[in-house]
Structures are given as structure tokens and as C-alpha cells.
């Protein structure tokens, strides 16, 4: 999971402004390994490892888009959702923009996608779409969190290793 065991790597990759696009699917739990609590699990949300629901002792849900936007490295950060056709079209546009940034060589782009998990929520697909809209949006508001047009950070003069200059500097 990007927000837990991948947290160190994603934060440092973003801070460096690496030229990649990251698409983070946030369904509020670890869906592929049994429905355990994840860093993005909502307060009160029941999971296989929090059967009584997430409580304060377990920490608040991590807002990854806001964390990424707070770093200097990323040039584009947006949170989108998939709960209706309008939102799916917005998600498509955000992903397209993030990939376009790569073709322009501008650096790190991050798109967080709020998604449904009917299996572990034990709801129908339609009910999970409503669940995302009603439960996740208040905690994870949609929208662009960062959009910069600056030049890539690596467009800086190359370091020199001229022996005389290095010796003079030290």
C-alpha cells in the first residue's frame, strides 16, 4: 500500500520531484489481502482488523494528496473519484494531465482516485458508489491540490569535476 509500507518511498520520490506519474487508488482499506484497515480507513469504518471500527487510538485517515501537495517536488496533485459518470470523466482528464506532464518532462505527478470496494464493504456496487460520495468525500475532498508550471528542477547547471576547481573550492 502506498500510504503504509510504501510511505517512505513515495514521500522521498515525490520530494525529489522524480519524473513519474503515480496513480493512487484509495478504497479505504487493503482490499486485495483480506479487507484490513489501511492508513486511509475512515474513522468508525469496520475492517477485518478493526471489527469495531477505526478509533482515535489508531490515528486519523492519512490524506495522501494533501501530503504530496505539501512537498516541493510534485508539480501536479489531484484527487478524483469514480462514483458517477461525471466523476469518472474528471478522473480520466486528471490521469491524462498527469501523463502529459511526463511527456513534457516536468516531473512528479500524483492522482489519488477514490474508489469503491463492494466486496469488503459488503454492499452492492451502486451502494458503494453512494458510500464513497457520502462517507469519503467529507474526509477526502476532491480537486486539484497543486498545479505548477515551473521548469523541471533538474534543468540546473551540471556539476563540474574539474580537478583544479574542486581543489580551489575546498
Provide a role label for each language-model segment:
Residues 103-170:
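Flexible, low-complexity linker and terminal segments
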Residues 6-8, 33-35, 79-80, 89-93, ...:
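A short secondary-structure junction signal
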Residues 27-29, 83-84, 113-120:
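Glycine-rich beta-alpha junction loops
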Residues 7-12, 32-46:
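Active-site-proximal loop->helix
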Residues 10-12, 38-39, 93-97, 126-134:
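Short, solvent-exposed amphipathic alpha-helical segments in soluble enzyme
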